[in-house]
Amino acid sequence: MYDTLREIICHRAPTTDISARWQAIEETKEHMLFFLENHDEQRIASDFFAGKAQAGIPGLAFMAMLDVNPVMIYNGQELGEKGMDNEGFSGVDGRTSIFDYWSMQSIRAWANNGLVDGGQLNDEQRAFRESYKKILNLVNNEKALARGHFYGLAYC
């Protein structure tokens, strides 16, 4: 599902590709973990992916509402982490290292000198995090989304 959503977010594929991908995972979908970012993939906000974090919001909403599968939010994703720092062995590649003793600016801003209250986030990061919060709270609190299933209208 990740590859399909990435292509759609980057305007290289139509949204109609989702139906085929969804059908392709029919037999294994109950074992799937959905994600838009992880340590192997480039950050949505990076120059190597979409260039802006907001571009991933529709993908997050879709994944979170697709079925009852868990959705992974990767370290700083909800803050719009760009992954464009030259850290350790990684270099500037749109990813964030899991191997180096290094910290991301977005996480430091969230940690706010140990208060862990987001006190140093900028307005854009706060608004972006709020979008994530709204979507994830809706999915967890709305019974039809939290426990429901769906049937695609384009299913064939």
PLM features: what roles do these ranges have?
Residues 1-8, 95-101:
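Acidic, His- and aromatic-enriched active-site or binding-groove loops in soluble protein domains
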Residues 2-14, 47-51:
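Extracellular glycoside hydrolase catalytic/binding regions
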Residues 16-19, 26-38, 43-156:
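Loop/helix patches that line or flank the sugar-binding groove of alpha-linked glycan CAZymes
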